[in-house]
Amino acid sequence: MTKRTKKVGVTGKYGVRYGASLRRDVRKIEVQQHSRYQCPFCGRNTVKRTAAGIWCCNGKGCKKVLAGGAWTVTTAAATSARSTIRRLREMVEV
């Protein structure tokens, strides 16, 4: 079976509807939400999205459930908050 879509990828299901720029944005989001991510607990690339904001590690013996962003495991706001908390903890320790 040959590859049917070269440029549009997963948004080929929309055909010519909704406009090219919207389909490009949807493609980026859908690729992010359907890909696998690295588990922060076991380190394997087995974290998959189960529902909006709920991510589950399917690794052997791990099976952890994570709360994250709707389309990706981590969001920009969560990353900045985590770095701020780490910096404040280092200031308190010193």
Swiss-Prot record:
Gene Ontology process terms (BP): cytoplasmic translation
Family label: Belongs to the eukaryotic ribosomal protein eL43 family.
Protein name, entry field: Large ribosomal subunit protein eL43A
Matches recorded under SUPFAM superfamilies: Zn-binding ribosomal proteins (SSF57829)
Sample GO molecular function, one term: structural constituent of ribosome
A cellular component term, taken from the record's GO annotations: cytosolic large ribosomal subunit
Zinc finger region(s), C4-type: 39-62
Note: There are 2 genes for eL43 in S.pombe.
Function recorded in the entry: Component of the ribosome, a large ribonucleoprotein complex responsible for the synthesis of proteins in the cell. The small ribosomal subunit (SSU) binds messenger RNAs (mRNAs) and translates the encoded message by selecting cognate aminoacyl-transfer RNA (tRNA) molecules. The large subunit (LSU) contains the ribosomal catalytic site termed the peptidyl transferase center (PTC), which catalyzes the formation of peptide bonds, thereby polymerizing the amino acids delivered by tRNAs into a polypeptide chain.
Cell location: Cytoplasm
The keyword Cytoplasm is annotated on this UniProt entry: yes
Subunit relationships: Component of the large ribosomal subunit (LSU). Mature yeast ribosomes consist of a small (40S) and a large (60S) subunit. The 40S small subunit contains 1 molecule of ribosomal RNA (18S rRNA) and at least 33 different proteins. The large 60S subunit contains 3 rRNA molecules (25S, 5.8S and 5S rRNA) and at least 46 different proteins.
Domain of life from the UniProt record: Eukaryota
PANTHER family referenced in this protein's UniProt entry, alphabetically: 60S RIBOSOMAL PROTEIN L37A (PTHR48129), LARGE RIBOSOMAL SUBUNIT PROTEIN EL43 (PTHR48129:SF1)
Keywords noted in UniProt: Cytoplasm, Metal-binding, Ribonucleoprotein, Ribosomal protein, Zinc, Zinc-finger
Species annotation: Schizosaccharomyces pombe (strain 972 / ATCC 24843)
Keyword Ribosomal protein recorded: yes
